[in-house]
Amino acid sequence: MLNRENKTAITRKGMVSNRLNKFSIRKYTVGTASILVGTTLIFGLGNQEAKAAESTNKELNEATTSASDNQSSDKVDMQQLNQEDNTKNDNQKEMVSSQGNETTSNGNKLIEKESVQSTTGNKVEVSTAKSDEQASPKSTNEDLNTKQTISNQEALQPDLQENKSVVNVQPTNEENKKVDAKTESTTLNVKSDAIKSNDETLVDNNSNSNNENNADIILPKSTAPKRLNTRMRIAAVQPSSTEAKNVNDLITSNTTLTVVDADKNNKIVPAQDYLSLKSQITVDDKVKSGDYFTIKYSDTVQVYGLNPEDIKNIGDIKDPNNGETIATAKHDTANNLITYTFTDYVDRFNSVQMGINYSIYMDADTIPVSKNDVEFNVTIGNTTTKTTANIQYPDYVVNEKNSIGSAFTETVSHVGNKENPGYYKQTIYVNPSENSLTNAKLKVQAYHSSYPNNIGQINKDVTDIKIYQVPKGYTLNKGYDVNTKELTDVTNQYLQKITYGDNNSAVIDFGNADSAYVVMVNTKFQYTNSESPTLVQMATLSSTGNKSVSTGNALGFTNNQSGGAGQEVYKIGNYVWEDTNKNGVQELGEKGVGNVTVTVFDNNTNTKVGEAVTKEDGSYLIPNLPNGDYRVEFSNLPKGYEVTPSKQGNNEELDSNGLSSVITVNGKDNLSADLGIYKPKYNLGDYVWEDTNKNGIQDQDEKGISGVTVTLKDENGNVLKTVTTDADGKYKFTDLDNGNYKVEFTTPEGYTPTTVTSGSDIEKDSNGLTTTGVINGADNMTLDSGFYKTPKYNLGNYVWEDTNKDGKQDSTEKGISGVTVTLKNENGEVLQTTKTDKDGKYQFTGLENGTYKVEFETPSGYTPTQVGSGTDEGIDSNGTSTTGVIKDKDNDTIDSGFYKPTYNLGDYVWEDTNKNGVQDKDEKGISGVTVTLKDENDKVLKTVTTDENGKYQFTDLNNGTYKVEFETPSGYTPTSVTSGNDTEKDSNGLTTTGVIKDADNMTLDSGFYKTPKYSLGDYVWYDSNKDGKQDSTEKGIKDVKVTLLNEKGEVIGTTKTDENGKYCFDNLDSGKYKVIFEKPAGLTQTGTNTTEDDKDADGGEVDVTITDHDDFTLDNGYYEEETSDSDSDSDSDSDSDRDSDSDSDSDSDSDSDSDSDSDSDSDSDSDRDSDSDSDSDSDSDSDSDSDSDSDSDSDSDSDSDSDSDSDSDSDSDSDSDSDSDSDSDSDSDSDSDSDSDSDSDSDSDSDSDSDSDSDAGKHTPVKPMSTTKDHHNKAKALPETGNENSGSNNATLFGGLFAALGSLLLFGRRKKQNK
């Protein structure tokens, strides 16, 4: 099993130790060295032959029997699949054309490589072990080809010319002879009839039993790792180091990491393909027992396959010649690390070289889906080797709505162990396409007819099935590395729906499914001691209405290897190194120097006995030297190097021996002849200073600038070093070789470079921003650079309100405060932001020379004025965005003007001729009408008059609410207001409100129509019969003066009656008037209001109201006064006392019913006919008793008593019907019938005593001269006494009075008095 959290391999209790395992199992096409890979099985593509991973092997068509020969009883009911045909899914390039129930007549069909999906790399491998095998460091690998191994070893062997006496140690024991076994994997051909379900429901009812659908599954051979018989010298045993240390820096490696396309289908799949890791490792002789080096691999790599125990196959490195362990392996899978610890082998042998040839895996856990340019890397020691690959997982097997995929995810096999044969796990994706399936069933079967040695099994005693439901939309790992914590365990829901068959099969009934499921089958291997066991397990998904689809997996077995070898010698050697600190002692980090010649002389004979040239790492070896004293001389040192001090320290293996020294070989190698050399180094630099006077020369009072970055480059422009100046402005580059260098100074912030190479003293001038410095056997401290503080300038000016919108600042125009102004550099980056002050001024300070961008934010309620008006840039507007240039002085010319946008308000005053309150097309404007504009507080703002077309307009108005008042033009009357629903056509009346909101308001109209004029007048006539009525025979009176007064009593007109007595006042408006008739001389006012309004007399003063029509009813009549001549002489003394008592009771009952119907249509002309019939009956009874005694002499006394009772009952019924039709002319007929009955009884008793001498007088009241006319032109007399019906009562009363006093009345005298 595999712990996915820390990638630590976990083995089950009781697992056989790997050292007893003869075989190990690898995943198909993962390509691990010395493995046979596992494959995913699906149906083939016809008669095409699949290609092996490395080469095509002879196919063993071992399974040619028909499906019927291998069928066993299966109880699963899948009858619904019988009639279905399977077709190829064009989208599945890795799929096959023959699936499910389909049978063809093509005979045996081979499954192409594209049809085989291998298991995934879940960081576990499979090992097989025979329990009777003994542990042996020289493991027998029957899959290895010795000839190929040896040739590869030689290919990897370095050309060590000094080892001419090396003897190759060849394996001689029987175990090593077994290495000659072929490494080729046997190609297994699997017939599809064996893959077919033995359940009859999976066989097409229409198929011919002779037409077998056979598909061959081919397992390609795998390339085994090549053992390296690495040549080594045998050294004398050295004391082991007391403390183990990491010696990654003391090993060198030549490594290749190759992605192997095992099935050569141009697709890299972690489960099918693998990585080939080959490396030749050279161990420095300084390495001691207990020291270690590491191999680090990336997260995308794992070092074992399906079996956690198989990690030991990448294990200790051994000498293949004698089986001796060179380095032991320790795995840290959590950190992707292998630590190799050296044994004392390295103490006893020199020039140890090791070769590894591993097949390692791609980790599907970190590569869950197909992805391009996936990096894989392995670091051996300190050297990292990388490669990349485009990962392309095969698609799921799909047929119609059915889809499936599977892989072996863990396999541990113990071949030959009956008690613990091992286990394996297969992961199956059911319905990964998340289609809705009906009656879905999954059949899992550990059987294939082409694999007779299949050690898989499925039954309820050894098999454990887990079922997980996948959330909708969840992305499954295409490498089948499943994190079950993210899924839902539904195993318990399906326990009763799992049916085990007798043919190593199980069927899971999912019923109706619309989501994906993950099925994990965990089962045990069958016991086997076969030399070539295989594992095959199939999975088939069926559902109603869809063709079934199948997939499967297969595995084979083999091993990994590594190794090395050596030979005992005596030699002199060690190391030439660059002693960078010149202390004469080798230290960590100091590197070797190659191509130095080392010559060894026999010190006794001065004979040259050996010569070598140091390798690139500085090491050298002079072999085959017997015991004795030798002189070692070093020559041909690299140019420019000098020798470090010799014999420093107390460790002769680490010190320097100098150019020539004598050493002794005594029974062991002498590796102490070292030489330390160093390359003299020089300095380059000087000074960065502030050139305050800008003369380009360092003056005594000018100080350095700290913190300036200085960069050193080689002649090719490669950066070598970077430093910053110190507090004094000094800088220095140290440890430089002779050569030409480039020095670059970074301009410090706020400074400007001074002039370059002023004067003649190169140590005092400025070399500028970039200069070249030469080192030639001495320091160069002359490279200086001067800077002066960059002058700062200001930019800005003014934002103003351009009230007249001319784009120029006028003296009366004021600044706008609070306007945001932004300064940007040439790249559009914001440098500063400010706001204008109360006077509209703004300024950006501290600016260097350059081009700037200034942006003005338009203030609320304003609009930018025109740009660039006039020729004076100091007062014009630069707009809302402009460019300002600073060149050695301030720039105070950047202005921007804005004005408040104003709008217009107004429209139209028109003559509404039809008085409908709506502007019609033919109605024209009224000119000269005064219109007043006020603000909300009634303050008058402007006054205009309408033009000749009736138009008016108020301009330059701000947003706001205004009041508009229209003055009624003379002779006009305002029309109706807001008629209709068109605000632009109706009348807003005399006073209205107008709102301006960011636009003109031209909707405020007012309509008027011409005020009608009327006439007033009629007639003054001579009332000859004094009855107060105009008779046809009575004529008018001319030259009677008539005066007209208005309501205020002011005289507005005077006229005289014409020769016919007619008069008229014209051009009058509706209103109240008073008409005064001046009585003609010698005439008397006749009675008033005696009859109809147009025939009677209205009196001397008449109040009248004109309402929308003429009034020609104002008449007045006069009659001529009577005259009398009498001569009388009378002497009379008369005393008259008169007492009159009068009691009068009057009861009057009056009932009046009046029904009137009137329909009237009137335009402008009216003709009226009126007929009136009136019948009046009046009965009056009056009884009067009068007693009168009169004594007349000269004195007359009269007493009169009168009692009068009057009862009056009056009933009046009046029916009036009036119909009037009028268009432009109106005719009106009015018929009125009136019946009036009046009964009156009057009783009057009067007693009168009168004493009269000669004179008797009586006064009677006169009818008033002034009457009031109402608007109906009906005259009404001013009230006298009583009510309107008092006329009849008074008649009765006066009748009684006249009867009682008849003798006393003198008619002639009364007329005189009336006059």
UniProtKB/Swiss-Prot annotation:
Positions of region (Ligand binding A region): 36-568
Q: Which GO terms describe its biological process?
A: cell adhesion
Q: Which residues form the signal peptide?
A: 1-35
Q: How is it modified after translation?
A: Anchored to the cell wall by sortase A.
Name the GO cellular-component terms: extracellular region
Report the subcellular localization.
Secreted, Cell wall
Segments carrying the region annotation (Disordered) are 54-185, 857-883, 972-992, 1078-1291
Regions that span the bilayer: none
Q: Does the keyword Manganese apply?
A: no
Instruction: Spell out the InterPro entries in the cross-references.
Output: Adhesin_Fg-bd_dom_2 (IPR011266), Adhesion_dom_sf (IPR008966), Fibrogen-bd_dom1 (IPR011252), Ig-like_fold (IPR013783), LPXTG_anchor (IPR019931), SDr/BOS_complex (IPR051417), Sdr_B (IPR033764), SDR_Ig (IPR041171)
Membrane-related topology note: Peptidoglycan-anchor
Give the propeptide positions: 1282-1315
Q: What's this chain's function?
A: Cell surface-associated calcium-binding protein which plays an important role in adhesion and pathogenesis. Mediates interactions with components of the extracellular matrix such as host DSG1 to promote bacterial adhesion to host cells. Contributes to the resistance to killing by innate immune components such as neutrophils present in blood and thus attenuates bacterial clearance.
Name the record gives this protein? Serine-aspartate repeat-containing protein D
